[in-house]
Amino acid sequence: TLFSALCHETLVQHGEEALEQLCAQVRQGKFLLSDTMPWYGETFYLPKPIAASESTEEVETTLRKKVKKLTWIPVLEFDRYARSLHEGHFTPDEQPESFGTHYEQTKAAVPMQGDTMPYQVGLFRFAPDCGLYFICGFTEDGQDEDLEYLLDWLGATGIGGKVSSGYGKFHVADKIYLNEPFDEQTEWMYHALSSEHAPYLLLSTSLPQADEMDHALEGASFQLVRRSGFMASDHVETPLKKKTQYALSAGSVLQNRYQGALYDVGLSDVHPAYRYSKPIFMGVTL
């Protein structure tokens, strides 16, 4: 994940004390991250809210299937989509069928002894004028510069599971301060992020703490996503398995906020394995 990559890069660039400072900021809610979300041209997209339609209007089958398949909603079409859940219907404006292409590439594993073994690597290439963005919340001066520095290094080294093969490189196209909105789209996002009125659209895959769970799920519409995986470590030769958790997916709609946590999901005593699970909410009308 992005947070795991930021932790690793912080450790490489600044050492253990800086890493613990970053984790402390997260625990205290002073550094928050959304999931990554797509953009196309000048348009930012939000996860389609997990909310049932109450509209009784008859909709053409082709259009109904097209809307059902949508995963992302343009920011400036969000309110129109929300209204269509109660009356009328939603016709998506022109947007890409997808933001890129999944494909496979054959690579070769060359052992010290024995035959070369081919294997497949799954890849994703973004379409022209498409990419990913995320929202980050800060409370202290200088945090944005620290993040930008880490992202510049990460862009050069890569992010993801195939960095050693040269994949996962990126560059930061722009940095926008949403508390200084400059057009209708950023104005909408700023007000939604500042809103303290339910319902709330969840932008971060995250898990309430045990004592928050019941209250957080009251009246909520949500999906669960399985979070598991392995932890790479310089202290052991093979990756270590991490605890499996089931978290609320981005796009879940909640009536009550929660704090979430930075969970230690390590299954060994080698060192902690942190999983980011703090939410960012948008107050929306649904």
Language model features with spans:
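Conserved active-site/ligand-binding neighborhood in enzyme cores
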Residues: 1-286
